[in-house]
């Protein structure tokens, strides 16, 4: 049987007989002696096969090739001084092989090199198609090991220090669509009826609070049928938590200690506490985003009142229609950003327009401190307005001022996107920085112009601020999101626990009494049986691991992810099923393949 893992061996084991299992990372023949790097999930160790010492093992080593699965028995020896490898944890030792047994060979050409010694860049589609090979590589091995350490740190903190208990909630549940589309599962036993895969354990964890389990957590699988991007997956993992009898401040404090524990345990990083806070209004005003990246400046400045009566209709018209005019100041932007990049066809212009802006206006601050204006802005900006713009933006000579004008939503989205683009483009972001913050005081609801109704900004179970109960359409929510380097890693709230308030919220978002009863009657009924005050939070575990590993894509934090087309390239899921299977489920497909036009 195995005595050690490859990556465990150190100088202390010199003279020890060992049995190792693993994969051939690479094989080298040097002057009649064969060297093999043997790899398992803990690392690699060098195997030596010398024909003068062990002819049999040498003969076996001659037949080894990359990725063969082998069992090796031998003795640990110290490396000669000239062969020490300080880059490897096992670099002080090597194993003189007495016996090599090939457990399995590679019978096809490898689609890419797996060896840790090979830094080959491999196309992502190929990596996902042969994911079992990709997971053998150092990068993905490290990522999944770190993911395991994160989960272990979470469990130890919540259970050992905070008395949480882990409870599993159903995966087959009821469809209550309020956000993304549900993944639906037909019931064979109950024809014509459907389960839904949970978008979160939200309702069940609230019911656990009603049940008296006052500190619950779960590493939960969740499912959302939504458009994908680099940091989203159709199935994902949450750290889900719920607590009774705690205030918002107490929940935030507990979660700061949890996050600090994770970073200390997994990365050895001491996080300063308390984390900074911004209200939703402050975040949107200063950054145009409710998940701002605060590793760099470039804060937005609202000048709507300054240009409201300006003759330039793009600005004044935006303000009169209820929108905004904001400036994104770029220090030293005159030297670093040309006009071509801001005008149609330029990369900065493209960033703004792809976020919905019609374009970008701009002015430059000359070296003498005066504003250099162009076109319609030049003809319509008074000296007083110029002076006020300089005062508010605190623009120094050489500063470029980019304007966004239009609806508040479009201005915020477009300038936020330009800000993020320039933060990277101008090298303003410290890649080692970890900027955590809370965003609080979100609106309870937002207006959906297409459907002509209010929608819950988070979800309809979020408790309104007690001071704002008179009008829920303008109420602040007792909600809190935690943001790391511009990405939301978690979000939560205090929950409604009184039936009358919950029914008012349902009414505010356009649910009739009958609809609310049909969808959430079981929850409303539970509120009649002594529901405690409670609140919670959920973290995107995949996204948190992505940030901790420094990866750009959430797919590199997951063992077997889907593509951005929601496909598994390894198993070729989703796939057709037989007519017999559909018939058993009383399901018929109405989908028809598109008709190809003839040439």
UniProtKB/Swiss-Prot annotation:
UniProt-listed InterPro entries: Aa-tRNA-synt_II, aa-tRNA-synth_II, aa-tRNA-synth_II/BPL/LPL, Asp-tRNA-ligase_1, Asp-tRNA-ligase_1_N, Asp/Asn-tRNA-synth_IIb, AspRS_core, GAD-like_sf
GO BP, one annotated term: aspartyl-tRNA aminoacylation
Positions bound to L-aspartate: 178, 224, 458, 495
Annotated site, Important for tRNA non-discrimination, chain positions: 30
Function: Aspartyl-tRNA synthetase with relaxed tRNA specificity since it is able to aspartylate not only its cognate tRNA(Asp) but also tRNA(Asn). Reaction proceeds in two steps: L-aspartate is first activated by ATP to form Asp-AMP and then transferred to the acceptor end of tRNA(Asp/Asn).
Subunit annotation: Homodimer.
Name of this protein: Aspartate--tRNA(Asp/Asn) ligase
Organism in which the protein naturally occurs: Synechococcus elongatus (strain ATCC 33912 / PCC 7942 / FACHB-805) (Anacystis nidulans R2)
């Amino acid at each position: 049987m195995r005595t050690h893992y490859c990556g465990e061996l150190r100088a202390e084991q010199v003279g020890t007989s060992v049995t190792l299992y693993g994969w051939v990372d690479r094989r080298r023949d040097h002057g009649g002696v064969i060297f093999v790097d043997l790899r398992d999930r803990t690392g690699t160790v060098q195997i030596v096969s010398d024909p003068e010492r062990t002819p049999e093992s040498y003969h076996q080593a001659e037949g080894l090739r990359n990725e063969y699965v082998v069992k090796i028995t031998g003795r640990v020896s110290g490396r000669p001084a000239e062969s020490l490898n300080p880059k490897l944890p096992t670099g002080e030792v090597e194993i003189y092989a007495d016996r090599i047994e090939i457990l399995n060979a590679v019978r096809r050409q490898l689609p890419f090199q797996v060896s840790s010694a090979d830094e080959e860049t491999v196309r992502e589609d190929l990596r996902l198609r042969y994911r079992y090979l990709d997971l053998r590589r150092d990068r993905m091995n490290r990522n999944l090991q770190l993911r395991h350490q994160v989960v272990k740190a979470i469990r130890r903190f919540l259970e050992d220090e905070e008395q949480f208990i882990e409870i599993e909630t159903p995966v087959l549940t009821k469809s209550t669509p309020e956000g993304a589309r549900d993944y639906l599962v037909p019931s064979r036993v109950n024809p014509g009826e459907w389960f839904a895969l949970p978008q979160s354990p939200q309702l069940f964890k609230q019911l656990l609070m009603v049940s008296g389990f006052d500190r619950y957590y779960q590493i939960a699988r969740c499912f959302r049928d939504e458009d994908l991007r680099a940091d989203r997956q159709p199935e994902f993992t949450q750290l889900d938590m719920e607590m009774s009898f705690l205030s918002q401040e107490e929940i935030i404090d507990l979660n700061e200690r949890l996050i600090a524990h994770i970073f200390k345990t997994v990365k050895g990083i001491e996080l300063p506490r308390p984390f900074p806070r911004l209200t939703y209004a402050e975040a949107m005003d200063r950054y145009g985003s409710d998940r701002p990246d605060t590793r760099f400046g470039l804060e937005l400045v609202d000048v709507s009142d300054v240009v409201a009566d300006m003759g330039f209709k793009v600005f004044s018209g935006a303000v009169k229609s209820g929108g905004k005019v904001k400036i994104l100041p770029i220090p030293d932007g005159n030297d670093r950003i040309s006009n071509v990049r801001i005008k149609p066809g330029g990369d900065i212009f493209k960033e703004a327009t792809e976020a919905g802006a019609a374009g970008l206006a701009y002015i430059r601050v000359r070296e003498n401190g005066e504003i250099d204006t162009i076109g319609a802005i030049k003809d319509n900006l008074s000296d007083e307005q110029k002076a006020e713009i300089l005062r508010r933006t605190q623009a120094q000579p050489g500063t470029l001022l980019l304007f966004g004008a239009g609806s508040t939503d479009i201005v915020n989205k477009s300038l936020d996107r330009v800000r993020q683009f320039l933060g990277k483009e101008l090298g303003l972001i410290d890649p080692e920085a970890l900027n955590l913050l809370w965003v609080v005081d979100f609106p309870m609801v937002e207006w959906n112009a297409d459907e002509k109704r209010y929608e819950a900004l988070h979800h309809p179970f979020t408790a309104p601020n007690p001071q704002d109960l008179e009008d829920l359409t303008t109420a602040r929510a007792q909600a809190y999101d935690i943001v790391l380097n511009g990405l939301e890693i978690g979000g939560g709230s205090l929950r409604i626990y009184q039936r009358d308030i919950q029914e008012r919220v349902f009414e505010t978002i356009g649910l009739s009494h009958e609809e609310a009863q049909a969808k959430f009657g079981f929850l409303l009924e539970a509120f009649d049986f002594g529901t405690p005050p409670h609140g919670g939070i959920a973290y995107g575990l995949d996204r948190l691991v992505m940030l901790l590993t420094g990866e750009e894509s959430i797919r590199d934090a997951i063992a077997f992810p889907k593509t951005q087309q929601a496909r598994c390239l390894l198993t070729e899921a989703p796939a057709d099923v037989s007519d017999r299977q559909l018939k058993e489920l009383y399901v018929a497909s109405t989908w028809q393949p598109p008709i190809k036009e003839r040439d």
